[in-house]
């Protein structure tokens, strides 16, 4: 990894993001992994999903169930290990919005604090953080106000972590694509476009 110790794994529903995040955590951390789960068992279907994920993880991994206050919980956990797998950021955003459902400004402030604490914890501890998160910004505009707030807040959270990440992977049909490796900048994009416009040949 680079000087950053954060890895972000993005993907849509059933894209393979959780599986890739888990496999990556095993390759990097082996048995020395703390799995941080943000899901809450609100119904039978979610309870089954949580149990399936639990059975799918290595028995040697420790599990911390933390729907809110993730960064603070990791920082203060006596069980902290060399690699932290957070699955998933999507549900952390959802939990924050549900707690502040009538005050989006408060939800934004809480989420900014959550992300800042996560980054600060990784920077000051000898650990690697793998974060699994959903990419929900490529579909239709949600009909409800809460849906739009969720999309916007998760998009901001993903961008914030990606800016601090050593690598960001986008899962496409189970295939991990290292988007940071093929990323461009505004300066490079403008330069390529000028060349294309002037020569008529794609850069």
Please annotate each region the language model reported.
Residues 21, 53, 85, 134, ...:
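Residue-level signal for inorganic ion chemistry
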């Amino acid at each position: 990894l680079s000087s950053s110790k954060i890895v972000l794994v993005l993907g849509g529903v059933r894209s393979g993001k959780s599986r890739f995040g888990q496999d990556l955590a095993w390759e990097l951390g082996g048995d020395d992994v703390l799995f941080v789960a943000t899901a809450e068992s609100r119904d039978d279907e979610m309870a089954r999903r949580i149990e399936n994920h639990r059975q799918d993880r290595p028995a040697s991994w420790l599990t911390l169930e933390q729907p809110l206050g993730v960064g603070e919980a990791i920082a203060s956990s006596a069980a902290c290990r060399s690699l932290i797998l957070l699955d998933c950021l999507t549900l952390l955003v959802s939990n924050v919005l549900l707690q502040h459902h009538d005050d989006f400004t408060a939800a934004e402030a809480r989420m900014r604090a959550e992300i800042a604490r996560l980054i600060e914890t990784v920077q000051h501890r000898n650990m690697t953080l793998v974060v699994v998160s959903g990419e929900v910004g490529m579909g239709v505009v949600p009909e409800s106000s809460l849906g739009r707030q969720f999309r916007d807040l998760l998009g901001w959270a993903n961008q914030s972590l990606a800016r601090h990440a050593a690598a960001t992977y986008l899962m496409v049909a189970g295939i991990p694509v290292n988007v940071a490796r093929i990323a461009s900048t505004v300066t490079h994009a403008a330069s390529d476009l000028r060349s294309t416009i002037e020569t008529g040949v794609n850069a």
